[in-house]
């Protein structure tokens, strides 16, 4: 669950933005900036809450920075996203130099009181950080918003036919900026979780390609929240399996684990493209 949570959070944010017709390839850079922002804020203030708020704010800020070019100026989305990824990676490395080796304050024990004492199940399911449970609650929430509410219908309409949505009086740029802001908040929370809870430390490039994996997961899950959840936990489970195998002396090449999400995405796209029913459903 720990390894899957950052992937799931980022992927759900990306999914909503892509449903509105925006592809943000800057996820890796935004996650890095959010990770260092959360780490800096926590070290300086001694409060994890302030750290998470700072990370979410930076995630939204960088997502809207991308929106200026991709939505406002109608620049090429792929080029703009790659620019944000490179910029975020370089800037985070520079401003994070003084914080390498910095010590975080002690935090309260994770888990749900009493339930985390249940044998086996308690440690597996009820001893996690609250962000893990938040990410799980977001799955049905995002699904309900997109497929059972009028604003969600508008978001999907903007993504599928922006000219028709504009003709009906909806502001396509505003809706896309709103979905990007939500996406930035999710990506920011994901980055903060990595630097404050999962690791917890700051190292240059610590996101280690998770932003790209989250992008691949959205395609792997065919833009459906529950399928994205399955993909995130599948690849998160593979990461933990690799660590457990290494701990008992079985060596698994890290390159294999790294390439698995992309290979699986290519296979899924190939299968969908060969089946007219799947194309219609997705």
Show the residue positions of the predicted features.
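Membrane-interfacial amphipathic/re-entrant helices at transmembrane-helix boundaries
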Residues: 1-10, 23, 37, 44-51
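Hydrophobic core segments of alpha-helical transmembrane domains in multi-pass membrane transport
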Residues: 10-11, 35-39, 89-93, 134-144, ...
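Hydrophobic alpha-helical transmembrane segments
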Residues: 29, 33, 49-57, 78-82, ...
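Transmembrane helix-bundle core of multi-pass membrane transporters
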Residues: 89-148, 248-257, 281
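Helix-loop-helix "hairpin" substructures at the membrane interface of multi-pass membrane proteins
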Residues: 124-202, 225-230
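Cytosolic-side transmembrane-helix boundaries in multi-pass membrane proteins
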Residues: 141-142, 160-174, 244-282
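Transmembrane alpha-helical segments in multi-pass inner-membrane proteins
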Residues: 198-262
